[in-house]
């Protein structure tokens, strides 16, 4: 084993904040609301800011400061239209990022399904890397279950369930009693107040259809 530092390329799933105009106040209020709605999920979360749709100059210093104070960690800027904009963002402390255009790669080999038989209590986090996650019990409020694949919960989901954590859009979330704080697939999420009441406390399946979350009731 080498005792020297090593520098390697890698990839991560990050949240992207898409700005529609150059109003810094609007952007900051938006991220503040998100952190207040789900502080355990968003607090200290890294975020990339996409400015491709912004017309006019942005106050990058105020943007970075405001997003940081709201609770996020601003990582960088993407979608800058010219070198001048890139320089302004860089001078404010933002990294300049671009979407990768790497060739299509074979899907990673899935790991065996992770099965948990005990209740997932508040404050606990369970992660199934490169595979599916099966919970044969309840997930309490304040608990978090994460999988790079799909999640099956044979009990009540009161906490947070995050499937497709590495970007797998075909992932699903199936639970026998939906009372979640947050449900997410491949970075798309709903908070509890965004879940239609007809699906509350029901056996359901969550999927991603045309880049939008879709819930359907399952027969018992």
Curated annotation (Swiss-Prot):
Which Pfam families does the annotation name? MinC_C, MinC_N
Extract one GO BP annotation from the record: cell morphogenesis
Entry keyword Cell division: yes
Keyword Chloroplast attached: no
List residues traversing the bilayer: none
Q: Which UniProt keywords apply?
A: Cell cycle, Cell division, Septation
Complex formation: Interacts with MinD and FtsZ.
Stored HAMAP family: MinC
Family as reported in the entry's similarity comment:
Belongs to the MinC family.
State what this protein does: Cell division inhibitor that blocks the formation of polar Z ring septums. Rapidly oscillates between the poles of the cell to destabilize FtsZ filaments that have formed before they mature into polar Z rings. Prevents FtsZ polymerization.
Q: What is this protein called?
A: Probable septum site-determining protein MinC
- This protein's species is Vibrio vulnificus (strain YJ016)
The root-end lineage is: Bacteria, Pseudomonadati, Pseudomonadota, Gammaproteobacteria, Vibrionales
């Amino acid at each position: 084993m080498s005792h020297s530092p090593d520098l390697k390329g890698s990839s991560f799933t990050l949240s992207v904040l898409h700005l529609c105009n150059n109003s810094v106040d609007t952007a900051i209020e938006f991220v503040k609301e998100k952190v207040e709605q789900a502080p355990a999920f968003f607090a200290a979360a890294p975020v990339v800011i996409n400015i491709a749709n912004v017309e006019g100059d942005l106050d990058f210093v105020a943007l970075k400061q405001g997003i940081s104070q709201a609770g996020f960690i601003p990582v960088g800027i993407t979608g800058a239209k010219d070198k001048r904009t890139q320089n302004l963002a860089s001078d404010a402390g933002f990294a300049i990022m671009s979407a990768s255009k790497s060739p299509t790669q074979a899907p990673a080999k899935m790991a065996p399904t992770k099965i948990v038989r005990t209740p997932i209590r508040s404050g606990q986090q369970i992660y199934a890397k490169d595979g599916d996650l099966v919970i044969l019990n309840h997930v309490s409020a304040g608990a978090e279950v994460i999988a790079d694949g799909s999640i099956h919960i044979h009990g009540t989901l009161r906490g947070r369930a995050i499937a497709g954590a590495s970007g797998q859009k075909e992932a699903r979330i199936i639970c026998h009693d939906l009372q979640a704080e947050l449900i997410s697939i491949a970075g798309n999420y709903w908070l509890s107040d965004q879940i239609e009441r007809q699906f509350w406390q029901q056996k359901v399946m969550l999927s991603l259809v045309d880049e939008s979350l879709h819930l359907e009731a399952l027969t018992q």
